[in-house]
Amino acid sequence: IYTPSKVVTQKEMEKHDGCEGKYTNGLYQDEIGFCDENEDAVSMALTAVSRMMQKSRVNWSDVGRIEVGTESLVDRSKSIKSFLMRLFSEHGVHNACGVDNYHACYGGTAALLNSVDWVRSTGTDQMALVVCVDIADLNEEQAFLNGASCVAMLVGKNAPMEILGPRGHHFMDTTDF
């Protein structure tokens, strides 16, 4: 997990907005992290993946798929996944498949479910890497929903957590906020 070091407590936000308890008790939020001028979705993803691979001691070549879930594009023609391949290339891995799932709050869920399905459907023992990264920067009325963070997860067979079916989906063309 990577969260930026710049934070604002939700107690401060409640005081500013005159709504004591709304964010801390109502939304169970303690603080909001914000990116510094030298941070973006790519740098957070690179940091989270580097740390996770180091701590897990998984061989880079054991990852056969990289799926990113985000709503924070940094380049409209280049995926965050392609930036992450820089780390894998440094370890001789150039063939990890996968894509970015660009879809508001569902992007990370889609990346996870796609990876679970890939692990189940393939005859390989390789794992999938799921990276969920976002930077929310909403208008002043919705500032309590702002924030930034990244999580990297490994998905593989015989994992300590199992994702079971059935699944339900409901999609509509709507404005979230």
Regions inferred by a protein language model and the residue ranges of each:
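Short, contiguous clusters of charged residues that form electrostatic/catalytic patches at enzyme active sites
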Residues: S43-R51, A110-L113
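Phosphate/pyrophosphate-binding loops at sites that engage ATP/ADP/AMP, CoA/4′-phosphopantetheine
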Residues: G21, A48-G64
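Acidic, glycine-rich active-site loops and adjacent beta-strand->loop/helix elements
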Residues: Y2, G69-D75, Y102-G108, C132-D137, ...
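Condensing-enzyme catalytic core mediating Claisen C-C bond formation in acyl metabolism
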Residues: I1-A41, F144-F177
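Flexible, glycine-rich active-site loops centered on histidine and acidic residues
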Residues: R120, T124-M153
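Buried hydrophobic positions in well-ordered alpha/beta secondary-structure cores of metabolic enzymes
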Residues: M52, V63-I66, A111, L154
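Conserved catalytic cysteine-centered active-site region
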Residues: T24-G26, E31-D40, S72-M127
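Beta-strand segments within the central parallel beta-sheet cores of soluble alpha/beta enzyme folds
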Residues: S61-G69, A96-D100, D125-V133, L164-R167
